[in-house]
C-alpha cells in the first residue's frame, strides 16, 4: 500500500518547519523525527534490499546551493556528500592507490636520470678541461697548428675549436638541465607526498566530509582561486615590464656572431637590383596587384569565404580526431614509460661519452674503473632493451599522431584568424561575420571557437587547472618518438633499437634487418649552376657559405672561397695563406652536372686539392630552374640542355666506382629555430677501411662553430661492415640566416683502444640552400679518402706548406693563384667529357693565359655591375642557336626552352647549359596559371537581409524576420539556459584533490612571480651598467627563449598582436571543445576521466617560467 494511503501511527503528528520542511512529532515519547514512521513498512531497511535508485530507511537526499547534492543519514545523524548507492568512492580509492605505484616508479626513474646526468656533467667537465689544456699547449706554436696537423688528426685546429665549444656548451646545457630537473623532481616529490597524505586521510573511517566541512573546503578553495587570479594579473604586469626592458637590449647577437661574412640580404648586398625584382616568389604581384579593383572585391570576398568555411570544417574534423585519440589514453600512463625511455637514453649517452673521452692524463686505476663502469652500463642497457614492451611502442605512436594533429590544429586556427581579419578588412560591412547570426561564426554563441571573456588568461578555472591544453612532449623526446616510428612498422620494434639523445640531437632509430628502407625525399630542383640561388626560399643574393678561416684542411669548399673573393674579403684572403696550396690546377673529382627537374641532387662529392677548384663539396643550392619549379611563376622547362651529360650524376644509381657514400637528410624547423641532421647510412665502407675488425662512427660538425652553440656530434660506434645503418639525428639551435653561412663537415672515424680518433674520409656540404619550409631533403654524398689525399699531396709539393703571412704580397699571391686555378679549371672543363673517370682527372697542367683571361673576366664584371636593372649572362656555345626570349616584367613565360635566370657573371660556369639573356622586349607569352582578367563572368547573387550582405550565399532561402538572419546578436535569457544533462558525482576525495591542487597552483604561481621579479632586477641592473646585450645564459636557455618570444609578441604592432591573441583564444577554446568531445566519445564515464586528470596534475609539472640558470663554465 502506498505511504500516502497509510495512516500515521497513534500518537504521531505531521508538522512543517519554518522553512517548509516536513517533520514528525511523537507525542508519546515527546520527540521529533525527520523520518516518517510509515517508511518502516514501505522502504527497504538496508542498501542490500534496495531496488533501482531508492534509498533505505533513514536516508534522505538534499540539496545545498554551495555544495550541491548531499545525503543525510538520520539514523546516525550525519551528512555526507557521497551518494551511498554508488560505489564510486571505493573505486576512486583503488585508482589512487594504483596511480601511487605508477608515480613511485616514475619518480625513482627520474631520480636515476638525475644521477646519470650528474655523471655526464662530471665527464663533460673533465673533457672540457683536457681539451682546453690541449688548446693552450697548441696555441704556443701556430705553425704546428697549421702544418703539423692533417685533416684526419683529432687536433685539427678547426675541429679542436669545435670540440672545445661543444664541450663548453655541453657543460652549460647539462647544468641548466640539472637545475630544471631538480625543480621537476621537487615538484613531483611534493605531489607524490601530497597524494600519499590524501590517500591516508581518506582511507580512515572518518575520511568523508560532512556538509559543514565540505562548505569550509569550498570556501577555502574559492579564496585561493581569487588569490591566483590576482597573482596572474601581477604576473602579466611583470611580463609587460620585462617586454619594455627587453627593448633596450640586442637579442640577435647570436646570429650576428655566426654571420661573420657579409650579409646575405638584398638591401646590404652589392648586387643592385630594381625594387620590383626583390621578390621573385611571385612576379605577378609586383605591378598587377597593387590594389584590388572594386569589380573584383566580390570575387575575392567569395574566395576568402570559401577558404574560411573550409578551414572551419578542417578544425572541426581535427577536434574530433583529437578527442578520439585522447579518449584512448589517460593522463599519467605515458609519463612513467617516457621516464624509462629517457633513462635508457641518458645511460646510452653516458656510455657514448665514456667511449669517446680521452683519458690522456688519467692513472691506470682510473682507466680501469672507467672500463668497468662502461661494461656494467652496457649490461644494464641490454637488460632494459630486452624488457621493452610493445604497449610502449603503440602508446608512443598514438602520442606522435596526437602531436601531429595538434600542430595541424594550430595551423588551421591561425589560418581562420587570418582569413577572418582579411574578410573584415575587405568589406565595409562585415556584420555578418561578427553578428553571430550564421551558424559556426567565429564569435557566435553556439559552436564558438573563440573563448569567452570569462576564460581570460588571468582567471582561475578547474578546466585550466587540470586540463593542460594540448600538452606535448618536450622537443627532444618528441623528435625521438617521430624518428622512432619513421619506418612505419606496426609491429613491435626488436630489442637493441633504443637509441641515444645527444646534446642537441634527439631521435635516433635503428632499422631491423629486412625492414623498410627510409625513402629519400627527392629535391624539386637540379644541381646548381651558380653560387647565387634564385629560389624563393632564400635571398636572391645569398652566396654559398665560406669555409672557416682556420680550416687547415685540403677538403675545402672551392665555391665558397671563390665567391668570397668576389666580395674582396681581406680577412679571408689573408687566412688562405695558411692553407696547403699547390701550383697546379689539377682536377681531382668530377664537377656536378645538372639533373633534370625533379631529380635528386648529384651524389658525387666534388673536392679540390686547394681552393682553386670551383666545387669542392656538394652544394645544397637549388638550380637555376628553381624559380620555375618552386614559385609557380614560370613553367619549368621540360628538358634541360646537357641532360645527357647529367645522366651519370643526378640519381642514387650513379654511384661512383669505388667511392664510399653516406646518406644524409637535412631539415630546418622554423618554429623552434633548430636545424636537424639525420645520418642515415654509410655504404661501401671497404673503400676507406681495409680492416673490418674496428668500430666506426660518424663525426658531424657545423662550421664555423660559434662559442655558444653545440656544433660537433658523434654517432654511436658500430662494428665495421660494408654497409652501416646509423639513423641518428642531431639538432643545432641556429637562426635561418646564420645557417646559410655554415658548412656541414662529415667525417668517418675509427677509435682505437686508447681512445684515439682517426678520420678515414669525409665531405663538406654547403648549407646555403637548406629549405626553410620544414621539408626534409635526403641525399647521397661521396666521401673523400684522407689517405689518398695525403699521398697525392706528398707527390706534388711545388709550393709546400706556407706559414701564416700577414703581408699584402702573400695575400695577392694567394688571390692570383686562386684566380689562376679557377680559370684553368673552366678552360679544361670545356673540353672534358662527363664520363671521365676519377683517375683520369688527376693530371697536372699549366696554362700561361690564365692571368689575361682573369683580367678580361673582371672587366666584364665591372661593366655588367654598372647596369641598373638588367643582367645579361653570356650564353655558352651550346646556346648560340637559340633565340633570345623576351619577357615582360609583369607576366610569366611559358616555353620549353630553359628559364631565364639572373646570375652574377663570375658565378656562372663554363660548360654549363646556360640560359638565354634576360632582356625586355615586346613579345609576351602568358602563363596558363595566370591571366590579368577573369576567364569567365562571375555569377553573383545578392541577398536582402538585416545584415545587408552581398556575399555568395550558401544558406537556405531568405525568410524575413527570422532569428538567424538578424545582425544583432540575440542572447538567450538565463531562464532558458539548458541545465546540464548530467551532473558529475563529487566525493570527498574530489574536494580534497581540488583543495590541494589550488594550493599547489598558488605555490607554483608564487615561485614564477619571484623568478620574474629576480629576472627583472637582473635586467635593470644590467641596463644600469650600460650593457647592450642580454645575458648569455638567458639567450641559450630554451625555456627562456620561449619567454622571450612571448615578450616579442607583446611588442608587435596592433594588428599582429590582435591576430595572435585571437589565435591563442581559439586554441584555448578548441582545447576545451576537445575536452568536451572526449567526454562524449569516451567509453569511460566522465567521473573517471576527471579523477585521473586530477591525480596526474600533482606529478606533471608545468614549468611556464623556468628557474634562473646556474653559473656557466
UniProtKB/Swiss-Prot annotation:
Q: Which family does it belong to?
A: Belongs to the WWC family. KIBRA subfamily.
* GO MF term list: kinase binding; molecular adaptor activity; signaling adaptor activity; transcription coactivator activity
Q: What is this protein called?
A: Protein KIBRA
* Entries under SMART domains matching the protein: WW
Q: Could you state one GO biological process linked to this protein?
A: negative regulation of hippo signaling
Question: Is the keyword Ribonucleoprotein assigned to this protein?
Answer: no
Q: Which residues carry this modification: Phosphothreonine?
A: 912, 929
Which stretches are tagged as biased composition: Polar residues?
522-532, 924-938
InterPro entries, A to Z: C2_dom, C2_domain_sf, C2_WWC, WW_dom, WW_dom_sf, WWC/KIBRA_Hippo_Reg
Coiled-coil annotation reads: 107-193, 293-431, 1001-1032
Tell what triggers its expression.
Strongly up-regulated by progestin treatment.
User: What's the source species for this entry?
Assistant: Homo sapiens (Human)
Which SUPFAM superfamilies does the entry link to?
C2 domain (Calcium/lipid-binding domain, CaLB), WW domain
Binding partners and assembly: Homodimer. Forms heterodimers with WWC2 and WWC3. Interacts with DDN. Interacts with DYNLL1 and histone H3. The interaction with DYNLL1 is mandatory for the recruitment and transactivation functions of ESR1 or DYNLL1 to the target chromatin and the interaction with histone H3 ensures proper regulatory interaction of WWC1-DYNLL1-ESR1 complexes with target chromatin. Interacts (via WW domains) with DDR1 (via PPxY motif) in a collagen-regulated manner. Interacts with PRKCZ (via the protein kinase domain).
Region named Interaction with histone H3: 839-1113
Gene that specifies this protein: WWC1
Q: Where is this region: Disordered?
A: 429-448, 522-547, 825-975
The cellular component terms of Gene Ontology attached to this UniProt record, alphabetical and capped at eight, are: cytoplasm; cytosol; nucleus; perinuclear region of cytoplasm; ruffle membrane
Positions of modified residues (Phosphoserine): 141, 535, 542, 899, 927, 931, 947, 975, 978
Subcellular location per UniProt equals: Cytoplasm, Perinuclear region; Nucleus; Cell projection, Ruffle membrane; Cytoplasm, Cytosol
Pfam families to which the protein is assigned, alphabetical: C2, WW
Q: Please give the record's comment on domains.
A: The C2-domain mediates homodimerization. It is a calcium-sensitive lipid-binding domain with preference for PI(3)P.
